[in-house]
């Protein structure tokens, strides 16, 4: 197996343990596995490459984790735990998430579509803008989105 493949496999195996809360902890663990040339910037690039996000593990600790493979996220997936706050004005709804989770949650919201009153979303790292299909019922859409993630509040 090529050296990069071994590094990628070791990196994925470490993240599956769901116990690393910082990039420096991942660097140390990889160095202990024999990857002595690894540094924080390489770990940062690998986290981005594999789409890793920080989320809460079963012990409620914020740790790096690989996203679930394929498929549209559902409301029964742990994404509910990643929503921090939902607010709105007269035109838009803003959803605040844990760092790195906004695009996954926006994908779920986009899959709901116009039938649920969502014209579209724009997601950054930890913020989602939701545009309703009509300006008037923004409060109704706000209530629907809040109910979708109500277990987070």
Swiss-Prot record:
Main location (coarse class): cytoplasm
One cellular component term from this protein's GO annotations in UniProt: cytoplasm
Gene3D superfamilies linked to this entry: 3.30.1360.40, Winged helix-like DNA-binding domain superfamily/Winged helix DNA-binding domain
Assigned keywords, A-Z: Amino-acid biosynthesis, Arginine biosynthesis, Cytoplasm, DNA-binding, Repressor, Transcription, Transcription regulation
Cysteines joined through disulfide linkages: none
Superkingdom of the organism of origin: Bacteria
Entry's Gene Ontology BP terms: L-arginine biosynthetic process; protein complex oligomerization; regulation of arginine biosynthetic process
DNA-binding keyword on record: yes
Compartments, record wording: Cytoplasm
A Gene Ontology molecular function term of the record: DNA binding
InterPro entries on file: Arg_repress, Arg_repress_C, Arg_repress_C_sf, Arg_repress_DNA-bd, WH-like_DNA-bd_sf, WH_DNA-bd_sf
Pathway: Amino-acid biosynthesis; L-arginine biosynthesis [regulation]
Family: Belongs to the ArgR family.
HAMAP family, per the entry: Arg_repressor
Role description: Regulates arginine biosynthesis genes.
Protein's name according to its UniProt entry: Arginine repressor
Lineage, broadest ranks: Bacteria, Pseudomonadati, Pseudomonadota, Gammaproteobacteria, Pasteurellales
């Amino acid at each position: 197996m090529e050296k990069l493949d071994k590094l990628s496999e070791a990196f994925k195996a470490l993240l599956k343990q769901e116990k690393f809360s910082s990039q420096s902890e991942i660097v140390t663990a990889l160095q202990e596995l024999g990857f002595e040339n690894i540094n924080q910037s390489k770990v940062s690039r690998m986290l981005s490459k594999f789409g890793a996000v920080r989320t809460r593990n079963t012990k409620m600790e914020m740790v790096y984790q690989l996203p679930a493979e394929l498929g549209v996220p559902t409301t029964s997936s742990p994404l509910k735990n990643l929503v921090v706050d939902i607010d709105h004005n007269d035109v838009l709804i803003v959803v605040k998430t844990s760092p790195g989770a906004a695009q996954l949650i926006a994908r779920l919201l986009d899959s709901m579509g116009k039938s649920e009153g969502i014209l579209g979303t724009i997601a950054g790292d930890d913020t989602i803008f939701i545009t309703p299909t009509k300006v008037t019922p923004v409060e109704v859409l706000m209530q629907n989105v809040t109910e979708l993630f109500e277990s987070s509040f």
